[in-house]
């Protein structure tokens, strides 16, 4: 239907409701129960005593006019509802308005500054009652209970004044006490779940009228059904409106206030289970936590540098220090449970530098090359441990003399991981206080385990154990790889003055033994922070996955305590810029380990064929001198040939043409 088919009265009612749609209003209910005082029955319709009050008389006359004008054509309402009930409703309407005006005067509020709506209804169980909606900018939610008490007082006083039953002064006082104590005026409230107290609940003025009051039917049979008698409001929009027009206003208001597009929201199972509204503080903390995890923030210093705004925001809140600590603990816990140390290192690899990365010339591999080791094999074994694939051998042990590169390799690995916990030997009672929720445990300069040997063995083997923390309860350490450096023999455990050899083999079974003995030059420097990410990326690129199955595929067996890192030997050309494929030589094939023959140039051939120079001292004399120094007699020493004799014998066996032909064959 088009808007032109509706009456002006209907459209004005719709616009008035839309104007006050979102206004918050108090919702009061007035009632009048049947009571008995000393055998005298006082019913709800016994309050029609005439009174000489022009204002009250004028209000009653206005309510009477409104009821007469809204009667239906069939006159069913007139025939079913007796005149006494109609007169009582009109009187109650005047009394309620009188109570409102008296409250306005007590609060110094002008009546034209308030918006109100009154509807008298009849219920099967409750009988007569009246709903009152009241909105004013000068009335706050906290004043709701005070307003109820004031209206209840005025309401009881007017009821006693207009009671048509002949009551004594004592009975009148008793009637007023009953009205006030029984709360014949109530206000809409809700009960708080935590405090278990009742608080005033505000309603939307326009929505409440359109969706609730205007949809009710007009009362026809007081004993058979429920409905409304009369409606009045401060805007005079529904005082004289008929029943059909009221429904039309409600329908139009509902259609016009309906949102144009309905957003479809998907509620997850977790949100349904939570069943509560998240506060802005919770949402802010969750957003901050996601940012910290994505940026791999694991310390307060990293947080200050990478996310200073969120750090200051939390620090400024009440209990900010605890909030920062707990948020950071959740971040480290998330990284420890979802990522391995190898994965955290691999994330930091610069792929643009990987193309020209020379593994053999990296500082870490230079240290391994000094010992004649297969540096790829060593790096592959370390990567497996960092990825929690070493099984019981969950610890990388760098040991040996000072200045051999133990700490600089361990430090580079720890910096690349980031989320690292350090063992504190000075804290005798709580040495692993910093090692919970970490991706790597770093033990620098480990010494005698002593009475903590069992804890060490459990952590070094990757077991889940619980440890005590200072000022807190016990906390669980999940399987975490360990990197350890030491100058001592940690396999020897001393408790007091007694050695415990039974711990030696279990400790060896838990260690990836890397013994460094070659002292580094003073200008060797530190390992670059980008080196280990590139090493891990290089291993993955060339098929050396960080799993023990892949390790045994390449190197034949799992690493042991006395692992020979020099076998199989590796060619010096490996990983040179022009080398594409990696080739290793098996230790079981001795021929493959022979050095490549160096071609001889012609000048070298001529030098070999020239006559040898004769030493001043014969070999026999040198032998005699050495034998005399050792206390050996000349008889026991066999005479050695001179250089001239050796040269003559060689030339007698091989001619110059034969020697030159052999050298040419080698060159080919």
Curated annotation (Swiss-Prot):
A motif (RCR-3) lies at residues 212-216. It is found in: Host nucleus. Its EC number is 3.1.21.-, 3.6.4.12. PROSITE patterns: PV_NS1_NUC (PS52022), SF3_HELICASE_1 (PS51206). Residues 193-197 are annotated as: Ori-binding. SUPFAM superfamilies: Origin of replication-binding domain, RBD-like, P-loop containing nucleoside triphosphate hydrolases. A motif (RCR-2) lies at residues 129-131. One of its GO terms (cellular component) is host cell nucleus. Its main location: host cell. It catalyses: ATP + H2O = ADP + phosphate + H(+). Residues 21-260 form the PV NS1-Nuc domain. The active site is at 212 (for nuclease activity). ATP binds at residues 400-407. Residues 367-529 form the SF3 helicase domain. The endonuclease active site can probably bind other divalent cations. Phosphorylated. Its cofactor is Mg(2+). A divalent metal cation binds at residues 121, 129, 131. It comes from the Viruses. One of its GO terms (biological process) is DNA replication. Keywords: ATP-binding, Covalent protein-DNA linkage, DNA replication, DNA-binding, Endonuclease, G1/S host cell cycle checkpoint dysregulation by virus, Helicase, Host G2/M cell cycle arrest by virus, Host nucleus, Host-virus interaction, Hydrolase, Magnesium, Metal-binding, Modulation of host cell apoptosis by virus, Modulation of host cell cycle by virus, Nuclease, Nucleotide-binding, Transcription, Transcription regulation, Viral DNA replication, Viral genome packaging, Viral release from host cell. Belongs to the parvoviruses initiator protein NS1 family. Multifunctional protein which displays endonuclease and helicase activities required for initiating and directing viral DNA replication. Also plays a role in viral packaging and transactivation of several promoters. Binds site-specifically to 2-3 approximate tandem copies within the origins of replication (Ori), unwinds this hairpin region and nicks one DNA strand thereby initiating the rolling circle replication (RCR). Cooperatively binds Ori with host PIF and probably other host factors, which activate the nickase function of NS1. Homooligomer; when bound to DNA. In the N-terminus, the endonuclease region is involved in binding to the origin of replication. In the middle, there are the ATPase and helicase activities. The C-terminus probably contains a transactivation domain. This is Initiator protein NS1. It comes from Mink enteritis virus (strain Abashiri).
